[in-house]
């Protein structure tokens, strides 16, 4: 069975260096129809005749052997036909139809699925990841056909240490975990949030080359406060209100301990937890396990890379970042994470007495120290009265007023409120103190974006730098000019963070490792690209980006003495690698989908 299958790659390592590039055989414990029903090993009609005999498949498949390339072309033809047949239909209908055809392939043949995904990442990432994954989560109970990942619920308390051994793979490198409490900008989706870990891990495989047999999407179901779901007869999760307080934390504790007991070297990514639990769990586990929270730390890294890019676009040295006036709208885990990492960057530039020009707003307006019952996580970024009285601002000031009076260099949205950067706000950005103001509308999915790029370029000026969380087309400004739309999405960082942490064998993921990832991404773009307003690379280059980010994270782990090595590569070998050798080492450890020979044991 695939659950105990193992690769003979290590046995063949030296041989492969001296011979032709033949994939190492994989030893399996299945035969016949069981192989055909296993998406990891199934090759459909691609099994050669010798393998059909070896695995008891002769007669179970049509006699013609179809090559991998022919299978690939056949799927792409079907996909293009679907695109043609759904022309003119609502976007949601088309998106779900595309997701279904990809999901059917994923359920049947993972090797072909990931090759299709890697080769067409620009077209398919928006389907298996943001923004379509949000639509999938909203409809998950109705779309459910085949389980993927593991589900731990409040009813499993006391059983998780044994449950973890129900997962069939003996080795897991990467886990993405959610409790479904804050899915994108869609709120509490309960168990239906499992679509997020699945989509994230698809990106880990496609971008970071994590072996798909070693990934595990996890849903931690502690109930839901979404009344619509509780009343839905098709809802697949627990029909109870969410656990809170120590009851909640005891469930998360038990799961984390179970994972660490079975796979102590696995990297765990926390995803889409509501803000209070996102910060609580990050503080609780980050020094004990190799884990990170993508909403807090991944989003922050991508945003910081873009913010540093805007300084370059203004023709200023990076040290001038300390003088940038930044208005952040959204005081959840993502917005606070961005400010925390930005503050760390300013402190490195100016010293511990840094006095950043950050202004934070939530649904109640500008956050100041005069606010009652202020969130402790927001307190470091709350403005004192003397800091804003000269601007004519006070507690609770609205967004338009803040932008008009602060005249920020950067307006950054992580509010989850679509259209909050309305006409008055965008026109006010035209009066920014910056020669090239930046607008980051980073909320996902598309409908939750704070503004669309067309409005931003029209109302705030053609010289702005623009970035969004979801993909948008570039804007035709006329006269041959293009308004470049950057996708400031975590996919540029989290695969590299996870890969670098894994290959270094890091005991935990430090702020320095995360900052190394952000700075690597920030330096990836050329001066010419930055001058044209292009802050982030093309997603077509995602594997190259991830290799460089992963290498930067690995080097940072080694420098901080957090690395313990991975596989047969120890810490001493990692220490002696040059920058170029580290990048090559990372590339060599990225899985790529090909049909390898299967040997039954």
Curated annotation (Swiss-Prot):
Entry's localization field: Mitochondrion matrix
Reactions mediated catalytically: (S)-malate + NAD(+) = pyruvate + CO2 + NADH
Catalytic machinery residues: 129 (proton donor), 200 (proton acceptor)
Cross-referenced Pfam families: malic (PF00390), Malic_M (PF03949)
Keywords: Metal-binding, Mitochondrion, NAD, Oxidoreductase, Transit peptide
Family annotation (InterPro entries): Aminoacid_DH-like_N_sf, Malic_enzyme_CS, Malic_N_dom, Malic_N_dom_sf, Malic_NAD-bd, Malic_OxRdtase, NAD(P)-bd_dom_sf
Annotated Gene Ontology cellular component terms: mitochondrial matrix
Domain of life: Eukaryota
Cofactor mode of binding and number, as noted: Divalent metal cations. Prefers magnesium or manganese.
Family the entry assigns: Belongs to the malic enzymes family.
Summary of subunit composition and partner proteins: Heterodimer of two related subunits.
Official protein name in the record: NAD-dependent malic enzyme 59 kDa isoform, mitochondrial
Species per Swiss-Prot/TrEMBL record: Solanum tuberosum
């Amino acid at each position: 069975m695939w659950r105990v299958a193992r690769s003979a790659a290590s046995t063949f390592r030296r041989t492969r260096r001296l011979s032709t590039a033949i994939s190492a055989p994989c030893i399996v414990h299945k035969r016949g129809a069981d192989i055909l029903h296993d998406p990891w090993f199934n090759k459909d009609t691609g099994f050669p005749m010798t393998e059909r005999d070896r695995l008891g498949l002769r007669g179970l498949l049509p006699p013609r052997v179809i090559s991998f390339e022919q299978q690939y072309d056949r799927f792409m033809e079907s996909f293009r036909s679907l695109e043609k047949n759904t022309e003119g239909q609502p976007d949601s209908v088309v998106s779900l139809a595309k997701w279904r055809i990809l999901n059917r392939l994923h359920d049947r043949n993972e090797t072909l699925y990931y090759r299709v995904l890697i080769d067409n990442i620009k077209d398919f990432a928006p389907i298996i990841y943001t923004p379509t994954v949000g639509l999938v989560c909203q409809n998950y109970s109705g779309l459910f056909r085949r389980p993927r990942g593991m589900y731990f619920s409040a009813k499993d308390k006391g059983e998780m240490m044994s449950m973890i051994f129900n997962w069939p793979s003996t080795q897991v490198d990467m886990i993405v975990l959610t409790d479904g409490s804050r899915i994108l900008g869609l709120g509490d989706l309960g168990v239906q949030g499992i679509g997020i870990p699945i989509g994230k891990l698809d990106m880990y495989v496609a971008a970071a080359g994590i072996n798909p047999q070693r990934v595990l999407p996890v849903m931690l179901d502690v109930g839901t406060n979404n009344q619509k779901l509780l009343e839905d007869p098709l809802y697949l999760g627990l029909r109870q209100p969410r656990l809170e307080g120590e009851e909640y934390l005891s469930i998360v504790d038990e799961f984390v301990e179970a994972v660490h007991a079975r796979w102590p070297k696995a990297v765990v990514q926390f995803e889409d937890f509501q803000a209070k639990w996102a910060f609580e769990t990050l503080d609780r586990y980050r020094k004990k396990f190799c884990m990170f929270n993508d909403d807090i730390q991944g989003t922050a890294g991508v945003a910081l890379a873009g913010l540093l890019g805007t300084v370059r676009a203004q023709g200023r040295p990076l040290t001038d970042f300390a003088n940038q006036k930044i208005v952040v709208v959204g005081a959840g885990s993502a917005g606070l994470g961005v400010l925390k990492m930005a503050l760390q960057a300013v402190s490195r530039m100016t010293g511990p007495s840094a006095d950043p020009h950050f202004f934070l707003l939530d649904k109640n307006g500008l956050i100041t120290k005069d606010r009652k019952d202020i969130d402790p996580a927001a307190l470091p970024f709350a403005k004192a009265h003397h800091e804003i009285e000269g601007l004519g601002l006070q507690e609770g000031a609205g967004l338009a007023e803040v932008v008009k009076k602060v005249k920020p260099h950067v307006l950054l949205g992580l509010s989850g409120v679509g259209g909050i950067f309305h006409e008055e706000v965008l026109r006010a950005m035209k009066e920014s103190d910056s020669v090239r103001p930046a607008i980051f509308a980073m909320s996902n999915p598309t409908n939750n974006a704070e503004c669309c790029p067309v409005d931003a370029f029209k109302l705030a000026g053609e010289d702005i730098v623009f970035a969004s969380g979801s993909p948008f087309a570039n804007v035709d400004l006329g006269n041959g000019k293009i308004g470049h739309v950057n996708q400031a999405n975590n996919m540029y960082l989290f695969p590299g963070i996870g890969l670098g942490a894994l290959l270094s064998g890091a005991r935990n993921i430090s702020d320095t490792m995360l900052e190394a990832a952000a700075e690597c991404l920030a330096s990836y773009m050329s001066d010419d690209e930055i001058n044209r307003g292009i802050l982030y690379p093309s997603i077509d280059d995602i594997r190259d980006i991830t290799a460089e980010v992963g290498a930067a994270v690995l080097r940072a782990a080694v420098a901080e003495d957090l690395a313990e090595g991975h596989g047969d590569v120890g810490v001493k070998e990692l220490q002696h690698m040059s920058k170029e050798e580290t990048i090559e080492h990372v590339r060599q450890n990225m899985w790529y989908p090909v049909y390898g020979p299967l040997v039954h044991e």
